[in-house]
């Protein structure tokens, strides 16, 4: 299974750098100079890219890739996602930490065992992580902050997330 670790947002400057939105908790290792990443463009075939240089830029990364020498080449990469195979990921020892792909697809229920839906996606925002839950009824999207005050437990074994939603949270959609 593939896991997205970054996405090209746009070109930066005229020398071929791209702005990359980080989707990994280990960008120093994933985007280190010399690292090779698989890239999947919005259209076209996957290919490998070698990182030549990287620097921080306002919560994102400015990345120079081998073979991308100008703005036109960088513009062609807009929307490209960088991928790793989940089998290559190190195991997580902390029972309270999760990879996004582990949470996606899990069943969400309230502390009273009332069904809410399934996690469709984990959103990474400036305010923290949010679970985008597709509701069982009507298929609407419910956004649940992934914080201890709301998410009371996560069971990998049962593929279930238990939430204690504040009043009105499940009505917002």
UniProtKB/Swiss-Prot annotation:
An accessory protein needed during the final step in the assembly of 30S ribosomal subunit, possibly for assembly of the head region. Essential for efficient processing of 16S rRNA. May be needed both before and after RbfA during the maturation of 16S rRNA. It has affinity for free ribosomal 30S subunits but not for 70S ribosomes. NCBIfam families: 16S_RimM. GO terms for biological process: ribosomal small subunit biogenesis; rRNA processing. Binds ribosomal protein uS19. The PRC barrel domain binds ribosomal protein uS19. Its main location: cytoplasm. One of its GO terms (molecular function) is ribosome binding. Belongs to the RimM family. The keyword rRNA processing applies. It comes from the Bacteria. HAMAP family: Ribosome_mat_RimM. This is Ribosome maturation factor RimM. Keywords: Chaperone, Cytoplasm, Ribosome biogenesis, rRNA processing.
């Amino acid at each position: 299974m593939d896991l997205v670790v970054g996405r090209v947002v746009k070109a930066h400057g005229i020398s071929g750098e791209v702005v990359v939105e980080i989707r990994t908790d280990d960008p120093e290792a994933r985007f280190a100079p010399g690292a090779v990443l698989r890239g999947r463009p919005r259209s076209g075939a996957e290919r490998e890219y070698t990182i030549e240089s990287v620097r921080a830029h306002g919560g994102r990364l400015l990345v120079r890739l081998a073979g991308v020498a100008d703005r036109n080449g960088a513009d062609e990469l807009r929307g490209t996602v960088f991928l790793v195979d989940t089998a290559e990921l190190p195991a997580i020892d902390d029972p309270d930490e999760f990879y996004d792909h582990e949470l996606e697809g899990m069943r969400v229920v309230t502390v009273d065992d009332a069904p809410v839906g399934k996690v469709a996606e984990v959103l990474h925002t400036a305010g923290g992580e949010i679970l985008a839950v597709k509701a069982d009824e009507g298929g609407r999207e419910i956004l649940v902050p992934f914080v201890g005050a709301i998410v009371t437990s996560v069971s990998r074994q049962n593929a279930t997330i238990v939430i204690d939603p504040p009043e009105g949270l499940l009505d917002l959609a």
